[in-house]
């Protein structure tokens, strides 16, 4: 196995919270998948959840080498959690096509947050 993609992103939680307050659910719908929205609407700390998802999706798009462009959208990525709470990445659409072209067989996602920031790192392995 070899690393074929690496991406990292950091999001300021307060900035995401302000965007959410300004644009409401429309901002969240632009970033989150349908499955993620189902979780989002039930949370008290929506801004923190959204900041972590935003950072993860930006990191994943950087690992693809495209960023959120060239047909890759936030909706192409869904962040889920396994039975132990470990986050993992599910790809769809153009992101899945590009990952296949890169020979990606394994994805790794690390998420962390503290008072002011959320950070994510994504590694794609062939």
UniProtKB/Swiss-Prot annotation:
Q: Which GO terms describe its biological process?
A: fatty acid biosynthetic process; lysine biosynthetic process via aminoadipic acid
- Enzyme class label: transferase
User: Molecular function terms in GO for this entry?
Assistant: holo-[acyl-carrier-protein] synthase activity; magnesium ion binding
Example of a GO cellular component annotation carried by this entry: cytosol
Xref: InterPro entries: 4-PPantetheinyl_Trfase_dom, 4-PPantetheinyl_Trfase_dom_sf, ACPS, P-Pant_transferase_sf, Ppantetheine-prot_Trfase_dom
Under catalytic activity, the entry for this protein gives:
apo-[ACP] + CoA = holo-[ACP] + adenosine 3',5'-bisphosphate + H(+)
Indicate where this protein is primarily found. Answer: cytoplasm
Q: Where in the cell is it found?
A: Cytoplasm
Binding site residues for Mg(2+) = 9, 58
Superkingdom, natural source: Bacteria
HAMAP family in the record, alphabetically? AcpS
Q: What does this protein do?
A: Transfers the 4'-phosphopantetheine moiety from coenzyme A to a Ser of acyl-carrier-protein.
- Put simply, this protein is called Holo-[acyl-carrier-protein] synthase
Q: Write down the species.
A: Vibrio vulnificus (strain YJ016)
